[in-house]
């Protein structure tokens, strides 16, 4: 059984929560809870409220996601 591909969508950080988690408002209006990917964490990239980010969302649970890129 093949693994479903993750959905990539852009959004804006609304709020920074404890434990490196963020509330993100996506382009389509949904709000998801997203955590920071390992590469962003490894390179100490700071993410603040108002930043535009790219989020990967699993098709199985669209309420949670992973932040994979912060736009400049």
UniProtKB/Swiss-Prot annotation:
Q: Which residues form the S1-like domain?
A: 1-72
Keywords of the record, alphabetical order, are: Cytoplasm, Initiation factor, Protein biosynthesis, RNA-binding, rRNA-binding
Main localization of the protein described in the UniProt heading: cytoplasm
What CDD domains does the entry give?
A: S1_IF1
What family is this protein classified in?
Belongs to the IF-1 family.
Q: Which GO terms describe its cellular component?
A: cytosol
Location in or out of the cell: Cytoplasm
Summarize the subunit comment: Component of the 30S ribosomal translation pre-initiation complex which assembles on the 30S ribosome in the order IF-2 and IF-3, IF-1 and N-formylmethionyl-tRNA(fMet); mRNA recruitment can occur at any time during PIC assembly.
Q: Which organism is it from?
A: Chlorobium phaeobacteroides (strain DSM 266 / SMG 266 / 2430)
This chain is encoded by the gene named: infA
Q: Mention one GO molecular function.
A: translation initiation factor activity
Supply the InterPro entries for this chain.
NA-bd_OB-fold, RNA-binding_domain_S1_IF1, S1_domain, TIF_IF1
The record, for SMART domains, names: S1 (SM00316)
Query: What lineage does the source organism belong to?
Result: Bacteria, Pseudomonadati, Chlorobiota, Chlorobiia, Chlorobiales
- Write the protein's name: Translation initiation factor IF-1
Top-level taxon in the UniProt lineage = Bacteria
Q: What's this protein's function? A: One of the essential components for the initiation of protein synthesis. Stabilizes the binding of IF-2 and IF-3 on the 30S subunit to which N-formylmethionyl-tRNA(fMet) subsequently binds. Helps modulate mRNA selection, yielding the 30S pre-initiation complex (PIC). Upon addition of the 50S ribosomal subunit IF-1, IF-2 and IF-3 are released leaving the mature 70S translation initiation complex.
Q: Which NCBIfam families match?
A: infA
């Amino acid at each position: 059984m093949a693994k479903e591909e993750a959905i990539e969508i852009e959004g804006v950080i609304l709020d920074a929560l404890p434990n490196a988690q963020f509330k993100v408002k996506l382009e389509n209006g949904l709000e998801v809870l997203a955590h920071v990917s390992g590469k962003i964490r490894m390179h100490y990239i700071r993410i603040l409220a108002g930043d535009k980010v790219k989020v990967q969302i699993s098709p199985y649970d669209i309420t949670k996601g992973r932040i994979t890129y912060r736009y400049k």
